[in-house]
Amino acid sequence: MNSFLLFFVGLVSISQLGAEELSRFKLMTFNILQGGGNAKNVGFGNELFGGSRIDEIASAIKLARADIVGIQEDCSSKSNMLLNELGDGWNRAGKVYSKFPAQLIHSNKDRSLEVVDVELAGSRVVRIVNCHWWPNNYGPFLAQEKLRADPQVDLNSLAKIVQEKGVRRGGTRGYSTTIEPLEEAIDEKRAIFLVGDFNEPSHLDWTENYARNGSDRWVNNPTGTPLRFLVRWPGSVLLENIGMVDSFRQFHTDEVKKPGNTWTPPYP
């Protein structure tokens, strides 16, 4: 699972707004895990939070001073618990919460994707694409499994296996469903931001440089073989190919000094 807990950046294509306008709002992506309910199976039981996590989730959003938040694993569409906890000044368009007026343009429930237009000050509109890709055949878990079975496995072969698993028949995560509205917005020269839980790492993190110089990605690795090798993860490659820019990597260009770690805390 590659769940974003407090990960403030997504992928962005900027065609209409300049840097000055973009600096006027803060965008956040946040997987709140199982609708903010009792997520004990992933280490977030309600008993740790006084019976409910909703107030802590709202507090985290406020602490981040976010203006727009793409939520994954949101509360039920019929429930406004989080919206109510955020308080006055917030509205909701599907799973996108905003201090600015927001309108749901498109949703695909099968692939947990929503397209939302947000109107900033001065009638400037940005498009937010919020996605949650399927977790099946999660590459790092597969790599851990292979390393446990054979710590001396050829890492180049292992990289090929985990890369191909994401795109094999029945194993895609939601790439095309996400790419389509992005390409449409880019063609229309809109300012667009992609946020989400991608359930897949980025090729900008799993580089040759990181494979040589980075730390072991596997906390308490029992195999003796560091989990670090070059992988051209297909999802992030596809996004880069259509012109999207990883905003985290744009500002933090050294993936060894600033690795893009987005693991949920209980996981290695």
Which residues are covered by each model-predicted region?
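Bacterial N-terminal signal peptides
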Residues: 5-13
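Sec/Tat signal peptide C-region and signal peptidase I cleavage site
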Residues: 14-19
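Active-site regions of metal-assisted phosphoester/phosphodiester hydrolases
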Residues: 20-59, 98-268
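Proline-aspartate-enriched helix->loop->beta-strand connector
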Residues: 57-61, 65-70
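Short beta-strand and adjacent tight-turn residues that come in two discontinuous sequence segments
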Residues: 71, 92, 249
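Acidic helix-start/capping segments at beta-turn-to-alpha-helix junctions
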Residues: 74-80, 198-203
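Glycosyltransferases and closely related glycan-assembly transferases
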Residues: 81-87
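A short, structured active-site edge motif that brings together acidic residues
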Residues: 90-97
